[in-house]
Amino acid sequence: MFGKGGLGNLMKQAQQMQEKMQKMQEEIALVEVTGESGAGLVKVTINGAHNCRRVEIDPSLMEDDKEMLEDLVAAAFNDAARRIESEQKERMASVSSGMQLPPGFKMPF
């Protein structure tokens, strides 16, 4: 199944990838993305740990329907969450690229 030194090399690659993933997770926790709704009238900024850092609401919305404003805030947060997930997937792909895995082997993440 594994060629000469294959298992040792695979273990070494797995350890290197684990170190890269740890570093990537630390970096992504610092990344901030901003989601928007209502054509930018509501903006929500979250970090890589999905913690809300900032909410910006255009003053024109303060006079409108409270329920609509709540919906816009939720939509902006969901947009930000999708953006941070996309960022995480991109970084994860770069961490695992180049690792030579046996056919059919799937990573546990």
UniProtKB/Swiss-Prot annotation:
User: Which Gene3D superfamilies does this UniProt record tie to the protein?
Assistant: Nucleoid-associated protein YbaB-like domain
Q: Does the keyword Ribosomal protein apply?
A: no
One cellular component term from this protein's GO annotations in UniProt: cytosol
Q: Which UniProt keywords apply?
A: Cytoplasm, DNA-binding
- Name any one GO molecular function: DNA binding
What InterPro entries is this protein classified in? Answer: YbaB-like_sf, YbaB/EbfC
Q: Which SUPFAM superfamilies match?
A: YbaB-like (SSF82607)
Cite the residue spans of the region called Disordered.
89-109
Q: Where in the cell is it found?
A: Cytoplasm, Nucleoid
Q: What does this protein do?
A: Binds to DNA and alters its conformation. May be involved in regulation of gene expression, nucleoid organization and DNA protection.
The protein's assembly and partners: Homodimer.
Indicate the family of this protein. Answer: Belongs to the YbaB/EbfC family.
| The name this protein goes by in its record | Nucleoid-associated protein NT01EI_1109
Q: Which organism is it from?
A: Edwardsiella ictaluri (strain 93-146)
Please spell out the taxonomic lineage of the organism that makes this protein.
Bacteria, Pseudomonadati, Pseudomonadota, Gammaproteobacteria, Enterobacterales
